[in-house]
Curated annotation (Swiss-Prot):
Species assigned in the record: Ralstonia pickettii (strain 12J)
The protein's name: Transaldolase
EC class of the enzyme, as a word: transferase
Record's keyword annotation contains Cytoplasm: yes
Pathway participation: Carbohydrate degradation; pentose phosphate pathway; D-glyceraldehyde 3-phosphate and beta-D-fructose 6-phosphate from D-ribose 5-phosphate and D-xylulose 5-phosphate (non-oxidative stage): step 2/3
Quaternary context: Homodimer.
Keyword Transferase: yes
GO terms (BP aspect): carbohydrate metabolic process; pentose-phosphate shunt
């Protein structure tokens, strides 16, 4: 049995790509996209017709409306391949604007529903800022499910759980990157790999906290750098994995054992944390890694959104 098939016994496998042709071979249950992945996909020749059709379907001169149409077009194509849910991301430039995030999420869901897609099959991705979490809380009350992304700390995870969000995406690889860079020449890949990988440990803490205190919010590990990180999180609710790493899992038959479980979480000695705004901001301020990676992630996604706009502009002008 391949590592991928073994992993699927413990964890829902999600494809992390906008390239829906690439995910067919791995039979994922769900899929996630983000501005960077969509930007990468739309530059491939095989997706040019989809891009041009989305521009026509938008029936708008607004680049913002056209990009929303492109995101939903890719999401619909992905949903024709997978049995589960697709995650579509709100513009990162709205990360500190609760009202605008809510409005954008409602608009994206309306576009999906206009194409016959039930809102239950769509997760709206929102950056895990305080303002983003408040938006997710409002959206939950209106039946719109959210995937809280750019999550790097337990403080963010606790705030999301208290808001009753559907799912969170802690970023394993980016946490690993920060600690590796911070350690410099003192980084020991053996001592700080496997179960001691700082990204793996972060997800383990969050998973155990959620299960210990019976939060229904799903935990989906994301942003992996290697197979070891994935295998160490076998048993996590979901793991979203790039096509390259899915291919490696499919080509290996090395054993995969369950590492995360509700039983282990319930046996752990865990202190409950406050989830109010001042506690959230204090804990984020005290966590240099989480603060820096959240800010960096928002900047990177915003930059790719701007690049996507530049790519769309000539198509809009020609339509």
């Amino acid at each position: 049995m391949t590592q991928l098939d073994q992993l699927k016994q413990f964890t829902t496998v999600v494809a992390d790509t906008g390239d829906f042709q690439a995910m067919r071979a791995y039979a994922p249950h769900d899929a996630t996209t983000n501005p960077s992945l969509i930007l990468k996909a739309v530059q491939k020749a095989e997706y040019r017709p989809l891009l041009e059709q989305a521009v026509r379907d938008a029936r708008s001169d607004s680049v913002e409306d056209i990009i929303d149409a492109v995101l939903v077009a890719f999401g619909c194509e992905i949903l024709s391949i997978i049995p589960g849910r697709v995650s579509t991301e709100v513009d990162a430039r709205l990360s500190f604007d609760t009202e605008a995030t809510v409005a954008k999420a409602k608009h994206l869901i309306a576009l999906y529903e206009a194409r016959g897609v039930a809102r239950e099959r769509v997760l709206i991705k929102i950056a895990s800022t305080w303002e983003g979490i408040r938006a997710a809380d409002q959206l939950r009350a209106e039946g719109i499910r959210c995937n809280m992304t750019l999550l790097f700390s337990l403080a963010q995870a606790v705030a999301c759980a208290e808001a009753g969000v559907q799912l969170i995406s802690p970023f394993v690889g980016r946490i690993y990157d920060w600690y590796k860079k911070d350690a410099g020449a003192n980084w020991d890949p053996i001592a700080q790999g496997g179960p001691n990988d700082p990204g793996v440990q972060s997800v383990l803490r969050i998973y155990n906290y959620y299960k210990k205190f019976d939060y229904p919010t799903e935990v989906m590990g994301a942003s992996f750098r290697n197979i070891s990180q994935i295998v160490e999180l076998a048993g996590c609710d979901l793991l979203t994995i790039s096509p390259d790493l899915l291919a490696q899992l499919q080509q290996s038959d090395a054993p995969v054992e369950r590492k995360l479980s509700p039983d282990n979480a319930n046996a752990a000695n865990i202190v409950r944390l406050p989830a109010d705004e001042k506690s959230f901001r204090w804990h984020m301020n005290a966590d240099a890694m989480a603060t820096e990676k959240l800010a960096e992630g928002i900047r990177l996604f915003a930059a790719d959104a701007i690049k996507l706009e530049a790519l769309i502009e000539p198509l809009r002008a020609a339509a």
